UniProtKB/Swiss-Prot annotation:
Belongs to the YajQ family. Nucleotide-binding protein. It comes from Bacillus cereus (strain G9842). GO terms for molecular function: nucleotide binding. This is Nucleotide-binding protein BCG9842_B4128. One of its GO terms (cellular component) is cytosol. The keyword Nucleotide-binding applies. PANTHER family: UPF0234 PROTEIN YAJQ. InterPro entries: DUF520, UPF0234-like_C, UPF0234_N, YajQ-like_sf. Keywords: Nucleotide-binding. CDD domains: YajQ_like (cd11740). Pfam families: DUF520.
Length: 163
């Protein structure tokens, strides 16, 4: 019974699901009447989404279609970091959205502070792009999971390797 229980807090985006959502969004854009004759497109370049359209209004519509498809495929949209709208070739506008993979140092500190404020007997350890939480009591780990889920973090977090 002296064995410690642990879990990892991670922030991941499943790239195959993102690709599927992009394909479905592109089909909808091709079939929608308000996009007929427009140069709207969505591309995935490594971990950056590139949205292109005729003007900012249509770009916002492309973004709305993409977000709806990402939500349906359970891809966390909190992990999308949108850049500025910029002019592209051929009278089009472009916007880049970076997929944030992993927990950066600032968010790891926020998670660490949330856990420390609970004053439970748990240990936290920041490992590269994840946070490991260890405790003797599984009830304490469940309380930590509930607290981190209810916290308003700028990224979406998942809990894996619960042992």
């Amino acid at each position: 019974m002296a064995k410690d229980s642990s879990f990892d807090i991670v922030s991941k985006v499943e790239l195959p699901e993102v690709t599927n959502a992009i394909n479905i969004a592109l089909k909808e854009i091709q079939n929608r009447y308000d996009f007929k004759g427009s140069k709207s497109d969505i591309k995935l370049e490594k971990e950056v989404l590139v949205l292109t359209s005729d003007d900012e209004f249509k770009l916002d519509q492309v973004k709305d279609v993409l977000i709806s498809k990402l939500v349906k495929r359970n891809v966390p949209i909190k992990n999308l970091d949108y850049g500025k709208v910029e002019a592209a070739t051929g009278n089009t506008v472009r916007q880049r959205a970076t997929l944030q993979q992993g927990i950066d140092k600032d968010n790891a500190k926020k998670i660490n502070n949330i856990i420390k404020e609970m004053k439970l007997k748990v240990k936290t350890q920041v490992q590269d792009d994840q946070v490991r939480v260890t405790a003797k009591s599984r009830d304490d780990l469940q309380a930590v999971i509930a607290a981190v889920r209810s916290a308003d973090l700028p990224i979406d977090v998942q809990f894996i390797n619960y042992r």
